[in-house]
């Protein structure tokens, strides 16, 4: 997956301070994704684009999942919060392998959890570090924990680009329910790197895009439904900014 690393290369001279703004973003994007992480089948769907930060309420898709809840400042640059998140399922109809194995769907669900987020600057580069735990409200679906680092890598006029790296851990129930295996050990589920970008083509309208490469680990990677251990996601859309 050498291409995945090349996606993170940007001109060093382009590094610029990106001053965060208090704004709301609402839109929609077209996404290409694997039928499930580990599938060779690639499918296309529509996803929301959302960024809203109030006091204390928030809703966003900018940290890897669709989530919303409340958050509070502990100290300048450090926030803690609780959230509900949409957890994607797995459709048998999207994969010929799942159909041949006659496996049932894994329905989408909702998780409840908490997070801690730190925002700062390293020199001219804005960075944020997110730690988050998510427990599915269906106890059989288990729990996951995320650690995500974001860094602004380009900011010039109307265009902003950020890079990120994420690691997600899962307990045994989460791995067993999604990857159709028994007696799984909990542990590192996947790691990923990606880019997010936006371009303002008017005062209120922005084009948004993202690309992500993801690698499975542990018992999930050796599941009988896993055809490949690497996957990619990409999306492009439009959003209204106010």
Question: Which stretches of residues belong to each language-model region?
Answer:
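N-terminal signal peptide c-region/cleavage motif recognized by signal peptidases
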Residues: 9-14
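Short glycine/proline- and aromatic-enriched beta-strand/turn motifs that initiate or cap beta-hairpins
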Residues: 17-65
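Outer-envelope beta-barrel architecture signal
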Residues: 18-26, 44-46, 57, 74-80, ...
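Transmembrane beta-barrel strands of outer-membrane/channel proteins
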Residues: 26-32, 61-63, 82-86, 129-135, ...
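Solvent-exposed loop/turn segments connecting transmembrane beta-strands
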Residues: 35-43, 59-62, 74-75, 106-109, ...
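Outer-membrane beta-barrel "beta-signal"
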Residues: 47-51, 149, 229-242
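Outer-membrane beta-barrel transmembrane domain signature
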Residues: 56, 118-120, 134-221, 225-227, ...
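Internal, conserved structured core segments that host functional sites
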Residues: 100-139
């Amino acid at each position: 997956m050498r291409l995945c690393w090349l996606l993170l290369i940007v001109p060093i001279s382009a590094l610029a301070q990106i001053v965060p703004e208090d704004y709301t973003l609402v839109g929609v994007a077209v996404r290409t994704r694997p039928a499930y992480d580990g599938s060779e089948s690639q499918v296309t769907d529509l996803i929301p684009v959302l960024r809203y930060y109030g006091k204390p309420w928030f809703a966003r898709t900018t940290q890897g999942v669709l989530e919303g809840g409340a958050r509070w400042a502990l100290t300048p640059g450090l926030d803690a919060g609780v959230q509900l998140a949409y957890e994607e399922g797995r459709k048998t109809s999207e994969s010929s392998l799942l159909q041949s194995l006659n496996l049932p769907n894994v329905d989408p669900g909702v998780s409840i959890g908490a997070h801690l987020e730190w925002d700062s600057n390293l020199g001219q580069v804005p960075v944020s570090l997110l730690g988050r735990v998510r427990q599915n409200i269906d106890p059989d679906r288990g729990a996951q924990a995320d650690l995500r680092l974001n860094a602004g890598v380009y900011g010039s006029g109307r265009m902003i680009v950020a890079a990120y790296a994420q690691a997600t851990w899962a307990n045994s129930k989460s791995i067993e329910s999604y990857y159709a295996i028994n007696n799984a050990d909990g542990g590192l589920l996947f790691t990923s790197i990606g880019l997010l970008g936006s371009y303002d083509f008017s005062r209120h309208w922005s084009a948004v895009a993202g690309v992500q490469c993801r690698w499975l680990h542990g018992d999930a990677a050796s599941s009988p439904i896993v055809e490949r251990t690497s996957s990619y996601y990409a999306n492009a859309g439009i959003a209204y900014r106010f």
